[in-house]
Amino acid sequence: MKKIFTLFIIMFSFFTKGNAQYDQLATEFSFNDTEGKEISLADYKKKVILVVNVASRCGFTNQYEGLQALSKKYKDKGLVVVGVPSNNFRQEPGTNKEIKDFCETSFGIDFPITEKLSVIGSDAHPFFVWAKKNYGSGAVPKWNFHKIIIGRNGKVVNTFSSITKPSSNRFISTIEKEHKN
């Protein structure tokens, strides 16, 4: 009987450990900014968080302008935009300092920009690994300027591909709906 009970406990612990990530919230992750300072999503609990993988040499780079406008318009209502530079698609070759300078001088970006990191593959940042495991392939960036909206509850509400502009009606209505929740 002891052996069966022990076996049951071992099997149960494997099962719960394998599913523990599903209980994790986006607000349990953190990034470093371009200067190495921590950007903890826990600081944005009860806010709507928009995580976007970005790049300075992409055909969608002009979306920085729309992201900044969105940040400015909804910041006081509790929206936080977090830009995540990535060279996974070979369009962000710059250093962290170059990325920061580009964002500030070209688009007046004042929302948090992380250090350059991987958003796909075996070396993807844990946030993106979590998003994929919990929300499927739709949460995985297929290109730069993939957008992940996190609700006030810390869970992914929706994802939008690169072709969806930050000014699109569907995108804006998702943001506004989350602000009402």
Where are each of the predicted segments found?
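Short, internal strand/loop/helix patches
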Residues: S30, K97-N144
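Thiol-/selenol-based redox modules, centered on thioredoxin-like
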Residues: P126-V129, K133-N181
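Bacterial Sec-dependent N-terminal signal peptides
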Residues: M1-D23
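Short histidine/acidic/glycine/proline-rich micro-motifs that form metal-
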Residues: R57-C58, P85-R90, L117-V119, S162
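N-terminal "domain-start" segment that seeds a small globular fold
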Residues: N19-A42
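Conserved helix-turn-beta segment immediately C-terminal to the redox Cys motif
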Residues: K47-V48, R57, T61-V84, E104-F107
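Amphipathic alpha-helical repeat scaffolds
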Residues: D33, N53-R57
